[in-house]
Amino acid sequence: MLTGKTIVLGVTGGIAAYKSANLASMLIKLHADVHVIMTQNATKFITPMTFETLTNNKCIVDTFDRNFSFDVKHVSLAKRGDLFIVAPCTANVIGKLAHGICDDMLTTTMLATRAPKLIAPAMNTGMWENPILQDNLTKLKGYGYHIIDPIIGRLACGDTGTGKMNSEEVIVEHILSFMAKEHDLAGKHYLISAGPTQEAIDPVRYITNHSSGKMGYAIAKMARLRGAKVTLVSGPVNIKPFCGVDLVPVKSAADMFQAVTSRSAEADVVIMCSAVADYTPAVYADQKVKKHDGDLQIELKRTQDILGWLGEHKPANQTLVGFSMETENLIENSRAKLLKKHADLICANSIAGGNTGFAVDTNKVTLISSQEVKELPLCSKEETADLILSHIQTLA
């Protein structure tokens, strides 16, 4: 995803510096060209050789180091870097950056660059909550810095509180959101639903389906990478949303209906990728239903048709996309759904093969609109999501 991109990683003098080695490794695996600049204090926690081995580039510490080919390094890297990330970033370096102090290679290069700048603070809770530190962060945000907030965790001092550097995975997601894709969806709001619903029978049991949510979450991720504002209404799944995605968790079909319909009017594109239950128990038992010798009969009633409601109340210029999953007559049934629900596009899934449908990481989708039927190749769900989003662009 980062092929051809140059990332400058700044490492400052905190205990979280050891995590920066893994961060550099993760960026290398995404095919980025990574250059590391360390403060002198950072070398007390991890050696420059570690980063040089991982990145195959010289790690720079000393502004006046003569042991490299002649160019003005702080200007050279400032021009070459497509993105700068300082992780961890100490309170000391935050203060320097906020006030334009350039007393080492890292702060000098950061001031010289015009590339996007991200910082991942890491420090004691008392330092993080100090008004001076928060003032400096406000200044940096005003200067265009993007702050990856620390999380609650066990700190070097033994305390538990806010100040632990965010995970390397989250930091990589923030980097990807800046540079992995062209932001051709910037300014658009995508409302996406994903996952199954759970229809409670009693406090212990519920009716659900096999949906893993992987397809919906992949669409949300790719839309975010392409610059869209994304709201994801999700049933119960075991997936973390991509950074920057606004997650709205729900359980039942009724919850899903309320969450989606109350937000649909403000969306440019609505994608109903969730597997919403068609039926729900007519009566909910407040106490656990006890087993007995005879059979148990549960009366079911229809749930509200979310896609149908969206089609009937669709604002002008909104694009409505639905999903269908069939075991037979895929095209015919999906085309009928397109017309009945007043949708602009149906993404038709067949679960006849073993590499498509629920839980797996690949999918094969047929796109059905009033103009055409387009069969997509079998590929990963993220690649499928990207192709779906590109096709939606042609409908707008």
Where do the PLM segments sit?
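A cross-family phosphate/adenosyl-ligand binding-site feature
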Residues: M1-L118, N124-G213, Y217-A396
